[in-house]
Amino acid sequence: MGKLEKNVFVIWITTFTTMLGVGFIAPIMAIYAQTLGATNLEIGLIFGSFALARTVAQIPVGVLSDIYGKKFFIVCGTFFYGVSTLMYNFVSTVLGFLIVRIFTGIFSAFVTPVAGSYIAAIAPKTRLGEYMGIFNSAITLGFGIGPFIGGILADMYGIKMPFYFCGFLGILAAIISYMKLEDIVFNKNKEKIDVKKISTLFSFEFLKNRNFSSSFIINVSNVMINAGIYAYLALYAINYNITISQVGFMIALTNILMALLQRSFGKLYDKLGNIMIIIGIFIISFGMYLLSTSTTFLTILASLTIIAVGSSISSTATTSLAVKDIPTHRKGEAMGLFTTSINIGMFIGAVSFGFLADILGIANMYKFSAIFSIVVGIISYLRIER
């Protein structure tokens, strides 16, 4: 195994291990918050605080990782994410839970954006799509199978056990990256960093780049669609006598499918280029329309499978396009900003599509999502520089 492959493998293992832990606690967060006396509004604040903290932190973290090295932030992020996750088991109030949630959001910003920029920096430019597909598969696969394992742990050993396992996996990921990962630093003259340079930590100048901004908007749209699916799929499926365990199976299966497909679609992007983005968007929209008309386990599963294929195509292509023309020494900053599209999409999608579901019903909300995806996708695609 060469040096490039070794570093990619270490990043993949570190990211997968961390996201596996995140998946462990995903099914039980709301239940655990309720045992502390949290209302539905407070549960919403708890979930939202993670995305908000992550969004605020990941842009400056991306810039600082370019200056001071990727390894430091990946090691610190995974370690303190693990430690802060362990603290869930020792909180006794909703406020304490909220504070811990904020810290886990901050430290999660040290991991995936920095790891993604690490891959973008070391990957050969002609194989960027392939390597970003490999990286994205670690996120999707880890979070895909994590909820199943976390649910089993909670049923067998109590609701606190997944938090212990998640914390352990975070610390394990820190140890792996500390021992095996090679550091990369782009600015070794740290003493020359001045106030003007620090002021660029929150720079949004990348959004002036049409390719970056188009990728950003498309990714927000795609994540909004996925947020609408995952937030309301169980409510939709229960109307057709589909059990929660079957819903969990469908989500896990589609996530694993996405993980398996992303590298191959990354290679296709390297060959075919930006046309892959619009192909993925049309497939997503077709799957969303089918989902809105599905009334059985098999038809819903088929719809989600189609959406997963489209998402695999589109997500790998948009991520690759976003960082393709960014200077190597600023890919961390760009990746940090680009990854905020995930948090923005999750928040806006869950809230806005929930509002529409109350007015139109969940099935019609899914139909609206299909139209929304196509309209936003086409407009953004036409803005991409040829």
Swiss-Prot record:
Its main location: membrane. GO terms for cellular component: plasma membrane. The chain crosses the membrane at residues 8-28, 43-63, 79-99, 102-122, 134-154, 156-176, 216-236, 241-261, 272-292, 297-317, 342-362, 365-385. Keywords: Cell membrane, Membrane, Transmembrane, Transmembrane helix, Transport. It is a multi-pass membrane protein. GO terms for molecular function: transmembrane transporter activity. It comes from the Archaea. It is found in: Cell membrane. InterPro entries: MFS, MFS_dom, MFS_MdtG_subfamily, MFS_trans_sf, Tet-R_TetA/multi-R_MdtG-like. The keyword Flavoprotein does not apply. It holds the Pfam family MFS_1. Belongs to the major facilitator superfamily. This is Uncharacterized MFS-type transporter MJ1560.
